[in-house]
C-alpha cells in the first residue's frame, strides 16, 4: 500500500516528457485547491497563499476550491473567505462530503452561480463558538461582546449572500442545522447540485474546468 502523497505523470509546459510529480502539485498547476481538513492557521495560510499566487499568475482564469471539512477556527475561516473576495479570479466552491460550520461559510463565499454541492454532500451552519468558559470574569465579558459582534457580522453575510432575512438566518444559527445538497440550494447556500453542470461545461467550454479533468 503506498505511503505519502500519490505521484502522477505530468508534463510541465516546455518539457518534452512527462515526469512524476506530487498529485497536489499537479492540482495547484491546474488552479484546483482542496480544503479537506479542520480549518486551522496552517491550512489557512496554505490556501490563501495559493489563491494570491494564482491570482498574480493569472487574474482571469477561475480557481476551484473543493471542500470536505468539519469547520474549525473562526478567524482562520474568515481569512479564507476574505481572500476569496479580494483576489481577481472567480472562485468556484465545490462541496463533497461535508461543509460544516466555518466550512459552510467558505462554501457560501464562492462566486454567485459558481457554488456547487455534490448530490450526497451535507452542509451545516450554526453560530460561532468560543472558549470563554475557561476565562476569568473580565475576560469572559470582553469575549462575549466580541463574539456577539462577530456573530452579527457572519449572520449578515449569510443573509446577504443567501437572500434570506437577517432574522431567519439568526434563528437558524441558534442550533446546528444540517442540510442536504437540495436543501442547501433552496436555502441559497449553493447554486448547483450534482456534477451534471461540470460534465456539460467540460464538453462545451474548454476554459470552464481544469484541462486534466476532461479525460476522467
UniProtKB/Swiss-Prot annotation:
Matching PROSITE patterns: CLP_PROTEASE_HIS, CLP_PROTEASE_SER
InterPro entries found in the cross-reference section: ClpP, ClpP/crotonase-like_dom_sf, ClpP/TepA, ClpP_His_AS, ClpP_Ser_AS
Compartment(s) of residence: Plastid, Chloroplast stroma
Domain of life assignment: Eukaryota
The enzyme's E.C. designation: 3.4.21.92
Stretches assigned to coiled coil: none
Subunit structure: Component of the chloroplastic Clp protease core complex.
Name the record gives this protein: ATP-dependent Clp protease proteolytic subunit
Gene: clpP
